[in-house]
Amino acid sequence: MTKEKKHYICSNCGNTSPKWSGQCFDCGVWGSIIEEKVISNKNIAKIGSKQDFEQLSSNVTDQVRISTPIGELDRVLGGGLVLGSAILIGGDPGIGKSTLLLQLVAGSFASKVKCLYITGEESLDQIKLRALRLDLVNDKTNILAANNLEDIIASLEANKGNIDLVVIDSIQTIATRELTSPPGTVSQIRTCAHELVNYAKQNNIIILLSCHVTKDGQLAGPKLLEHLVDTVLYFEGDHNNHFRILRSYKNRFGGVGEIGVFEMSSSGLIEVTNPSELFLMKREQNVIGTAIFAGIEGSRPLLMEVQALIVPSNMVTPRRSAVGWDVNRLSMILAVLSSRIGLNLANYEVYLSIAGGLKINEPASDLAVAASLISAATNKPLPEHSVFFGEISLSGEIRKTAKAEARIKEALKLGFNNIICSKSENLTHDFISSIAHLKDLKLLLGSS
């Protein structure tokens, strides 16, 4: 016998409470507490059915992957889509998630995989107009406008065996009749996503869930969907910039940290197969305060431009700002430069930016940042065709970094023949300038 209970849940963070309150005690948000019905069962073991165990034998075949016509997507996924997998694609509203998903299911992919595009945000006519604008109109892709979970499951059951891939755009618009809370709340998102993922795994179909992120970059509040799915992808970019980056943050069938680069155009998303060349295109030489960093994103080497600007300040605490880089790490590099080579910027405002709207999390970018700061402070350009990579310790030493050969190969391919890196890399080529300390960098750049 089941017993119906009620509790109160925060629509922002998912925290539950037995009583209503005006403010969530966990996240502090006001007016976010809503009532939710909970069905509990005290005799779960009695109503359950016995399941047979299986042994983890060596007779296991590799997962069959389905290659898509979007090579950058395949790179991020680890080689293609896996049957029975659940994939979550998050990103800001309007960043291009729907465009990417429509290009996937309505392109040449639809001729070999039976696809269903379910929209909860747009009407069918809007989807058709967007497909017409992107030149994706075909008679192979099925589309459905639905907001109710039960209707979606019933439609999938009625077409069982005729669907290989399902797109839900977006999960925030789907609701179940079992809950009284409105669509988009934590309980609705969690319940609907759980049911859809379970259905996909039981029927060995691929499901892609589109999900908006909140202001602080979280998926539907407390990232409550990430543990439900096999793969989590984030679509990153700036609305004022035409570059888009698809990055993997979780992948049970491939590597984490892989990126795919796209360019947004009037005809949709265009793959960028050589992002280093694109990000450095039409770049002027001998620009003061700029340095090229040879980075690694996942398994892909990528050259990025680091820009620094230093201006005098009358403020007691001059401003330090960083776009695309950790501002706390910038403060650390400034402290090391001041302590180890006497570059005191205490009375200057410091601004750092990564060109192209990219974000760098690698410690190996320390050396490029330091070089750009020295160039901006001394008002001298860096040597032409130079590339930097290396981690800087608090003592000012330049540490060894991973995948140095791949970084150097990418730099040489694009015409950069002056590689400045750590001496501990043990590389003796003529085009490599090995340094052990920031003092060596200062001498190499000819700063006084």
Swiss-Prot record:
Lon-protease-like as annotated region, ranges: 349-448
Biological-process GO terms, alphabetical: recombinational repair
Superkingdom of this protein's organism: Bacteria
Keyword Nucleotide-binding in annotation: yes
HAMAP family: RadA_bact
UniProt note: domains: Has a putative N-terminal zinc-finger, a middle region with homology to RecA with ATPase motifs including the RadA KNRFG motif, while the C-terminus is homologous to Lon protease.
Protein name: DNA repair protein RadA
Organism: Rickettsia bellii (strain RML369-C)
